[in-house]
Regions:
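Short beta-strand segments at enzyme active-site cores
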Residues: 56-62, 93-97, 205-209
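Binuclear metal-dependent phosphoesterase catalytic core
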Residues: 132-138, 142-156, 163, 268-332
Length: 424
């Protein structure tokens, strides 16, 4: 009853409620550790927030999956979660592809999804078919890169400029530009402006939904997350300036960066909602959010970040020796750990076994070797570079423990053992 009364109140005030989320990365692992159960729990939390806040539409700004070919359990979780969010067509859900997603996979279930009020946009030039549901949800107008919706419990329409991820060459191709010298920024700015002038007036809410790298011109670029496929690289897509956004747009809902952040407030809030879980140790201790927006015609969007509480915290821990590490692990069981141990000798197999038996959430153990002292008597350390090849690491270990390098015959034997293990 409270939900119905609240929705009637919003309708009287012409308030449209939008929930912005992104970067679900379903199927993501932390090294070999599955995050599936955490993803189940955090998506259920997002569904509960959407229900509690009487949200009219949910926007998912790309990186729905972590790979082009996600596991079956992740696909199942994705569709079941969207169906719950859509609430039998009473609430619209719009999802776009990110740089981790296969656009064809994202769009494949679109005909069936539309029957539930779910819209998938895989490509920058995708055009959403017109449709109307018994709930009152309707696509009123549509063309490549644009969709206008009539939401069941809102008086005013919602206009969305949709720009899923594509690399620079493909983006230009999709938007009909063949000149390789034309800047991507100009191509997008011109296209967005054309759509905004055609469709986005003050009689409805107007927003941009994208999975690209936005920045304020002249500002320091935000860091792309660790373990993330970067966008800013040769063959990717250049950074887009907030000044390229049409003045008619009231909010820009972005995906790609995993930390919730407001890139700019002009010409409107330009916001990365961030991922719902911490997916790498560079995100350790980050608080995760979804962003609730309240729209009224011809007014600035009102933002309310809502904190998410599900998922195991990620911890980076540095300990002086194995004993100190064991004590910390016993006192902090409910987390995922990147453990650095300062030691004067390589960790042996029994030490590693004891550490892993003590804590089920150890993702990586990094030995930090003592290398004597500096001129002031302070201990000097160096991390073992785990990005090196296994053969190089073995040679360094042998040198450290024996005081001389392994001879060629021993290295050949080591290579044979490793090869047999891979075959096995």
């Amino acid at each position: 009853l409270e939900c119905i009364q609240s929705k009637k109140y919003d309708l009287i005030l012409n308030i449209m409620k939008i929930l912005h989320t992104s970067d679900w990365h379903l199927g993501k692992r932390l090294d070999t550790y599955s995050r599936h159960q955490e993803q189940v729990e955090v998506l259920d939390e997002i569904i509960r927030i959407a229900d509690a806040e009487n949200v009219d539409i949910v926007l998912v700004a790309g990186d729905l999956f972590d790979t082009f070919n996600p596991p079956v359990e992740s696909i199942d979780l994705f569709y079941k979660s969207l169906k719950c969010l859509a609430n039998n067509g009473e609430r619209a859900v719009v999802c776009i592809a990110g740089n981790h997603d296969s656009p064809d996979r994202i769009e494949a279930p679109d005909p069936l999804a539309r029957e539930c009020g779910i819209i998938f946009v895989g490509y920058p030039n995708s055009e959403v078919p017109l449709f109307k549901l018994d709930s009152g949800l309707e696509v009123i107008r549509s063309e490549a890169g644009f969709v206008e919706l009539k939401l069941p419990h809102c008086n005013e329409p919602l206009r969305i400029l949709t720009t899923p991820y594509a690399n620079e060459i493909r983006l230009k191709s999709y938007l009909g530009v063949d000149d390789p010298e034309t800047e991507l920024r100009k191509v997008l700015k011109d296209r967005w402006q054309q759509l905004a002038e055609k469709y986005c007036d003050i009689s409805g809410a107007n927003l941009l939904l994208s999975h690209l790298f936005f920045t304020k011109e002249g500002a320091t670029l935000p860091e792309e997350p660790d373990d993330e496929k970067p966008i800013l690289h040769v063959g990717g897509a250049q950074a887009i300036y907030t000044s390229d956004i049409p003045s008619q747009i009231q909010y820009v809902a972005l995906g790609h960066l995993h930390r919730k952040q407001i890139i700019d407030q002009e010409p409107c809030p330009v916001v990365y909602s961030g991922s719902p879980l911490s997916y790498s140790f560079s995100e350790a201790n980050q608080t995760k959010y979804v962003v609730l927006l309240e729209f009224q015609p011809d007014k600035r969007a009102s933002l309310k970040p809502i904190e998410l509480h599900k998922g195991l915290p990620l911890k980076r821990v540095r300990s002086q020796g194995v004993s100190e590490a064991l004590e910390w692990l016993k006192q902090n069981p409910d987390c995922l750990v990147e453990l650095t141990i300062v030691t004067d000798a390589y960790l042996n197999a029994s030490d590693r076994k004891l550490l892993n038996q003590t804590h089920q959430g150890i993702i990586q153990i990094i030995p930090e070797m003592l290398q004597g002292t500096d001129s002031d008597g302070n201990p000097q350390t160096t991390n073992i570079n785990l990005s090196k090849g296994i053969e190089e690491l073995f040679a360094e270990y042998f040198q450290h423990t024996k005081g001389l390098p392994p001879d060629p015959s021993l290295m050949e034997l080591f290579k044979e053992v490793i090869a047999n293990k891979k075959d096995f």
